[in-house]
Amino acid sequence: MAGVLSLQFTPKSGDKQFNLQKVNEIISEYSDKKLDLVVIPEFFSTGICDDAFINSPEDVNGGEVVKFLSETARKYNTNIVCGTASERDGEKLFNTAFVLNRSGELIGKYRKIHLYNFFGGNEGTY
């Protein structure tokens, strides 16, 4: 039987450190369940906030959030799929999902191509 943990919480908009700590607390709470996969929601690190999306993107080779996810995957011996975080590649910003294995290796990522532009969302602007 596979152990899967799907996180749901309200991130503090623009407070990356608080949000990463919250993710760690939730995973820690369930770590005795032998988790095979942890799924983290979209914009978990910054909340849905245009300023945070623009001003604190991940480096294309992995920044603070990817390093945190890598350490967390190793610490809890689990695979992680994070919804999305902003990622910078040159001058472009992307809404990117990251996949890490139990060893903390970044084994995949997906950049959204159909971005949210209705009901006030502005992802397509970037």
Regions found by a protein language model. Give the residues of each.
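A short acidic, glycine-rich active-site loop
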Residues: 56-67, 125-126
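Catalytic metal-binding/acid-base residues of hydrolase active sites
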Residues: 10, 44, 85-86
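Residue-level recognition of beta-strand->loop/alpha-helix junctions
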Residues: 8-10, 41, 111
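Active-site beta-strand/loop signature of hydrolases that rely on acidic residues for catalysis
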Residues: 19, 27-57, 73, 80-81
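N-terminal phosphate-binding loop and adjacent alpha-helix
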Residues: 8-28
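A short, hydrophobic beta-strand-centered structural micro-motif
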Residues: 62-88
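Extreme N-terminal starter segment of soluble prokaryotic enzymes
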Residues: 1-6
